[in-house]
Amino acid sequence: MPSRGCSCWLLSLALLCSLAAAKEQYHEFVIRETTVKRLCKSHNIMTVNGQFPGPTLEINEGDSLIINLINRGRYNMTLHWHGVRQMRTGWSDGPEYVTQCPVRPGQSYRYRFTVAAQEGTLWWHAHSSWLRATVYGALLIRPRDGTSYPFDVQPTRELAPILLGEWWDMNPVDVVRAATRTGAAPNISDALTVNAQPGDLYSCSSHDTAVFPVTSGETNLLRFINAALNTELFVSLAGHNMTVVAADASYTKPYTTSLLLLAPGQTTDVLVTFDQPPGRYYLAARAYASAQGVPFDNTTTTAIFDYGAANNASSAAIAMPTLPAYNDTTAATAFTTNLRGLRKAELPSRVDESLFFTVGVGLFNCTNATAQQCGGPNGTRFAASINNVSFVLPSSTSILQAHHHGAPGGVFTADFPANPPVQFDYTAQNVSRALWQPVAGTKVYKLKYGSAVQVVLQGTNIFAGENHPIHLHGYDFYILAEGLGNFDAGADTGKFNVEDPPMRNTVGVPVNGWAVIRFVADNPGVWLMHCHLDVHITWGLAMAFLVDDGVGELQSLEAPPPDLPLC
């Protein structure tokens, strides 16, 4: 049996080896206009380094990144590293006016952070206006050198990441500005995309199709990212099953399925064995549209998986998968409820903060306004809220800067409600019109460092109930349960999965239903929680947690960097 001194020496040696294995990467991300042609029309779009999608970042767990953002575009810009915990480095999280002021044209800012205790697929995207329509890319986090994936079958190789997106035949910034000006719903997208290509089912798009060469008999790792702005997506690969092994950079128990569901912001890693007759097979994606009577992009995007066989003539028919109906909530629920965490959850036994948040769309009444400003139903303006508070971004400084300097006055208030102001039948078919109008404000909810937090996310049917993908910055959380109708603590708490719940950073709150999440507030700073349908965050479906510093340096937010942009 080794002595205590020997054990300590071995532990120190292991720690030093671990630190030595970690690396630091430096990248320059230059924002600039680039001309691209889709659907027979050329557009000048915002890109990073002229690439669309943007550069793929590939690191190992424990590595650090320095990203020098140089803005040579014509819009303010910030970048968000979606799903990265940003432990104590909230200044690099990216949402404009929440953790930083935007990087203005002609300016630059260096994002600095370490990716620790996370493996799998994350991504990065613009967090200003609707610029993430074209400014996005993959962030791949592999196990440390010498460590294999925790899969029974190791992949022969990894394919290029599969980024699902949306394309507008106009400037997406103009789309959201028009909606904001008029109070109406924004124009829907003109196409869905795979790796920025619509696929050959669209008019004037026969050559705009992503192709993935594959080898017969191999098992490959495929990484899916839903980078679309406003569309949840069903995804299927003709003739092939997919075994889910990770979601949002958290490993899952293997789950074999022919269908994936990804909400905007979510990622899914799957293993696929290419064991079908040599040929070409479509990967297809189309909308899961849960809101009744709401327009959506009902097109289908495709990519081709090509075995490359000698007899695989280009004129041969390409196998097409069968996708569910657009509104198939049963199929959507079946996928999400089958996900389980790979290991037993490290779940806090106590709950210090028990919160109940209603999430949904509403309407602002118009008074003394012109018809041009009231383009919503019956002369209203569209709105959205959490607990009837429609979130408003500050403009004079960021929330985190105001908090750090101890000067919240005029920027935010720390009075976000723990419960909705009025209890009602949240999912009723006819909700009283008196409950449709939220209150606008910039409110945060304060959490003590280390507190165990449980949030019931309750969807409402105030105006067109639908599935809401809720993303929490700075944290992963356990999804304990989800269900339809109104959450009933007495009946539904017993349904909680406390053994192996999936861990994610974005949860789909079912249409006219609920989801329960739990996390420990161990990361000081200001952390946005919002719907990842950009139309909804534009309307105010967001709030922020303000997590106080703990004890000592390692439980406190780092000092702001010297190049932090000013408003």
From Swiss-Prot:
CDD domains: CuRO_1_LCC_plant, CuRO_2_LCC_plant, CuRO_3_LCC_plant. Binds 4 Cu cations per monomer. GO terms for biological process: lignin catabolic process. GO terms for molecular function: copper ion binding; hydroquinone:oxygen oxidoreductase activity; oxidoreductase activity. Glycans are attached at N76, N187, N241, N298, N312, N327, N365, N368, N378, N388, N430. This is Putative laccase-17. Cu cation 1 binds at H80, H471. Its main location: secreted. InterPro entries: Cu-oxidase-like_N (IPR011707), Cu-oxidase_2nd (IPR001117), Cu-oxidase_C (IPR011706), Cu-oxidase_fam (IPR045087), Cu_oxidase_CS (IPR033138), Cu_oxidase_Cu_BS (IPR002355), Cupredoxin (IPR008972), CuRO_1_LCC (IPR034288). Pfam families: Cu-oxidase (PF00394), Cu-oxidase_2 (PF07731), Cu-oxidase_3 (PF07732). Cu cation 4 binds at H468, C531, H536.
